Amino acid sequence: MRHGVSGRKLNRATSHRLAMFRNMVTSLLQHERIFTTLPKAKELRRWADWMISLGKRGDLHARRQVMACVREKETVQKIFAELGPRYQSRPGGYTRIVKAGYRRGDASPMCLIELITEAKQPPRKEKAKKPAPVQAEEASATPASEEKAQD
């Protein structure tokens, strides 16, 4: 029984799966977006969020945990120097998955997984209010003037 067991096996051996996700999380954090299948991206999101959360902590133990997963020193440096401070005020959810159709060969659902960039949104422009119809104003103004004249 697999009660409470999280994660996806993706029909791979344990060593292959771990190596694949280590490579994928390294590529994602290095290039900030990659193109992959949807099940891989959903599992990769967990790994990437974990690495960025460790980058936000920034202590020695967190650095050693990241180095156990990400084997490239430049990427580890980027996690702690750029990504950790960038997402310091964000409590989680550092990645976005955008579906991109199906692969031609085997119809696998493909997607783009990318790191969220917190860009400032432009201020919303208020829509210009439409002027009231002219006919309605004239019709309501005429009886009021006639009533005053009759009094």
UniProtKB/Swiss-Prot annotation:
One of its GO terms (cellular component) is cytosolic large ribosomal subunit. SUPFAM superfamilies: Prokaryotic ribosomal protein L17 (SSF64263). Residues 131-144 have a biased composition (Low complexity). Residues 118-151 are annotated as: Disordered. Keywords: Ribonucleoprotein, Ribosomal protein. Pfam families: Ribosomal_L17 (PF01196). One of its GO terms (biological process) is translation. GO terms for molecular function: structural constituent of ribosome. Part of the 50S ribosomal subunit. Contacts protein L32. Belongs to the bacterial ribosomal protein bL17 family. HAMAP family: Ribosomal_bL17 (MF_01368). NCBIfam families: L17. This is Large ribosomal subunit protein bL17.
